Amino acid sequence: MTSPKIIVTRSQPGADQTLRALKDRQLEAVLSPALTLSRSDAAVPDLSRYGGIVFTSANGVRFLSDETDARDLPAWCVGPATASAALLEGYSPVHQSSGDGSDLSHYIAHHWPSGTDRRLLHVANAAARGNVKTALEAEGFEVDFLPLYEASTAPALANAAYRLISTGDPSLVLVHSAKGARAFLDLCDGLDLSALSYVAISEQAAGPLREDGQKNIAIAPHPDEAHLLETLDDLLSRI
């Protein structure tokens, strides 16, 4: 039986990385990023005031790296993709936690070097929740939030994705965030989505899908790209 086609809704440049991973698996996929990322108007503060930078996405790493050449502050990253982006940009040292922002906060609190300035800068999407800031402040850190980039709904579905959904053929949609899931549903307004199944990076990311009544949602056991793709592999093996 032919594997269903896969729709990648992740924003760029990460979407291209996901597409390459799918091609390595000899899977047919179409790109249709549900979100467009852009620089916000937030000013970057003097980084010398901080004892470290908290990154909860690879995009945060990329946007900050475009703004400053400073790389000497410890980078505290959620997940391997964010840590890899920080290493590629030359940050040192780079610390990596597994899980989500709450796990990262716990990791920082338990691995923070004694005697080091406990003031942190959290770089993220303007719509990011304040969970990281709240959790770290409860552990005695002083945290400034820098909403360095914004994510807005893409103008439309990619033509290939629109045609694929319109055919009614079974297809799989990869979902990397709750905001991306909500944007994808908005872009699909008026389309019959009954033939779609979903693989979401986390239960939080799947939230808008469940609220919309979507069915056939598989959740990665850990919120990172590797486990998302493993969940996809497992799902395809049972089709």
Question: What residues fall within each predicted segment?
Answer:
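Signature of uroporphyrinogen-III synthase
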Residues: 1-239
